[in-house]
Amino acid sequence: MNHILFLLTAAFCFPSITVAKIIEAGSPDKKNVITIETDNQVSYSLSRNGTKILDTCPLSLTVGNDTWGTDKCRKITRKSVSEKVEFIVPRKYKETVDNYNQVELIYKDYKIEFRIYNDGVAYRFVSTANNKQPVKKESVSFRFGQDHTSYTLLTDQLQNWFEQDYTVKPINALPKDSFSVAPVMVEVDKYKVLLAEANLYNYPGMYLQPALESFHGIFANYPDKEVPYEGDNKIYVSTRKDYLIPTCGKRVFPWRVTGIFDNASSILQSELIYLLSEEKEQAADYTWVKPGKVLWDWWNDRNIYHINFKSGINTDTYLYLVDYAAKHHIEYVLIDEGWSARNDLLTLNPDVDIPRICEYATKKGVGIQLWSKWVNIMRQMDEAFAQFSKWGVKGVKIDFMDRNDAKMVNFYEQVAIKATQYKLLVDFHGSYPNEGMRRKYPNLMTREGVIGLEYNKWSKRATVTHDVIIPYLRMWVGPMDYTPGAMLNAHPETFYENQHEPMSQGTRSHQLAMYVVYESPLQMISDSPTKYDKNLRSFEFIKSIPTTWDETVPLEGEVGEYIALARRHNDTWYIGVINGATPRHIEIDLSFIGNGPKKIKAHIDGVNAGQQAKDSQIIEQVIKDNEKLPIDMSRGGGYTGIIHIEK
C-alpha cells in the first residue's frame, strides 16, 4: 500500500477533570453521526441523515478481574485521515481512499477507538500495557430500538461449516437460543445495515445472537480438550477454558463494525472491512502473487471422456488437465483430495506422480495447487510447505477448519506466514468468512464460508434466490469462493442432486454472470473439460473474464431479487447481471463509460431459457449515447456483456 495523502488534524486532548461525558462525531460527508457516552459505562448510538440506526449500545471488555469501559476516561483525542490505498490484489478497485474521522478515549491501561466512515462506523479496544491477565469476556451489542427485518445465518453450534441458509425474519421472530455467522444485515427504514468485524488476530471470531430488537456478540472460549473425529479428518473441541484468550498483552483487538448503506447497490462499493484491517509489513514482497482462474477436478468428479485413458485420481488425468489449462490459457490446476495418504502429505498416492505433474505444468506455464485437510497442514506445515515449494506447487487449498476460536484464528495466520515464506497462494475452505487478514497477507486469495456450487451435488440449497443474497452480504467482507462454471443447468422442477455429473440451479447465463459479479482473485472453473468442449461458446466467455478489477460500478439491484454491476479491467468493461426467481426486464444507463457508441458482445438467456435452463445466445449490441442497454432475463437468469473501448 502506498500512502499518497495523509491529513491529521491536531489532536484535541482534554485533562481528565474536563473530559466530556458525551462526545459527538460525524463522518467526512457528515451523514453518519455517532454519539459516545463515557459516564459509568461507555456506550454509543448512531444515526444517518437524522434517522436512528443504532440505539444506545454499551460496550466492555473483561480482562482478569477488570472490566474495561466502566472506569473514568482520562483524555479524548480526535483526528481525521484521508489516505490513498493501492490494492496489491485488486478485488473491486485498483485503488481507493481511506477517509474517516476518529475519536479516541484514553484510559489508564487501554484505549477505545471509534472510526466514522461515510459507509459505516467501527470501534475497538487497544491494550496499551503489557497485561498478563486473560481476556474473559467481551460485551458487544447492536441495539436498534425497534424490530426490523434481518438476514441471518443461524446455527446453535460454535463448531460449524459457516455455510448456513439465510433466514429472513424480523429480529424478534428469530430463535433466541441460536446465533448467526457474521455479517448480519438489518433493514432500518430504507437503509441496509451490516454488522461484522475486522482485523481479527489472536482472538475468537464474533457470532451475533438475536435478542429483543438487537444482536449481541457471542464468542467461543479458548479450546481445552480437542479430540479427532470422522476418521481423524477433523478435530472437535470437547471442552473449553473459561477465557477467550489466555493473555491480553499489549495489542489491538478486533473492530466491531456497522456498515450503513442507502441502498443494496451501494454495499457493492464498500471496502470497509479491508480498510479497517492491518497493512502488510512495509518490506514484505508479494510481487509473486498471481491471481487467475483455476481448473478444478473435484466438483465434476473428474468426469472426462472421449479420451484414451481411464480418468480419475491418477497422473494421466492431471497431465490432461494441465494440457487443457495451457491450451485455454487457464493459470492453475487444482488437485483436490486423494493425491496423498489420508493423514500424511509427504506420502503420495502411487497413482499420482506429483513431482512429474508439477514439472510438466511448469513447462506448460500452468501452476499446480494442492488440497489438504487442515489437520495435516497443522501437523506437517513446515515439512509439507517446504516440499511443495521444491515440487513447484503454487498454492494450497486448506479445508475443514470449521471453527473460529482464537486457536483456530491463530492457525490461519500461521498458514499465511509460512505460505508467504514458500510463495504459496492460499484458499481456505470450511472456513469462517473474511475479516481482513488478506490485507496483511495478500497471498490469502479467497475463502469459502458460503453455500456454493458444491451443494448442488447433494442438496437443493444453492438456489437462485440465495445467489442474489450472497453478493450483498457474504461478499461485503471479502472474496468468496463460490466455485461457478456449471454447464448442466436446470430449473427447480428438473433439478436433481448428482455427485458424479452435477448440475446448477438457474440458467447457463446465470452461471456465467457469476464470473463478473462474484469476487474471487482465484476463480474456479468447476466443470469438466468434456462439458466445456461441448459448450465452447459459453466457455470462451468464461475464459475471457478476468479475476481482478480496476474499477467497480454498481448499477442496480435488490437483496434476494437481482444484482447488476459493471467492472473494468484495463480498458475493457464487463457487465454482469444475476437474476433471482422472477423473470425481469431492466435497462442500464452506460453513460459512466463515456461518450460514443458502445459495442457489446453479450451472453444472454435464450428465448426458451425459462423452460430449458441451458438455452443461451451470444449476441452483439450497439448502444448509442442517448440509449440504454435493455436486458431481458428468464427466471433464474443472467446476462454477461463485454465492452471493448476503442481509443
For the regions a protein language model found, what residue spans apply to each?
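Carbohydrate-binding surface patches
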Residues: 559-595, 639-640
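Edge strands and adjacent loops of beta-rich recognition modules
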Residues: 91-97, 541-565
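Aromatic- and carboxylate-enriched substrate-binding clefts and catalytic-loop regions
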Residues: 335-507
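An acidic-aromatic substrate-binding cleft motif
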Residues: 248-324, 328
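N-terminal accessory beta-strand-rich subdomains and adjacent acidic, glycine-rich linkers
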Residues: 22-277
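Catalytic cores of secreted or luminal carbohydrate-active enzymes
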Residues: 509-555
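C-terminal beta-strand-rich structural cap/linker in extracellular carbohydrate-active enzymes
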Residues: 620-647
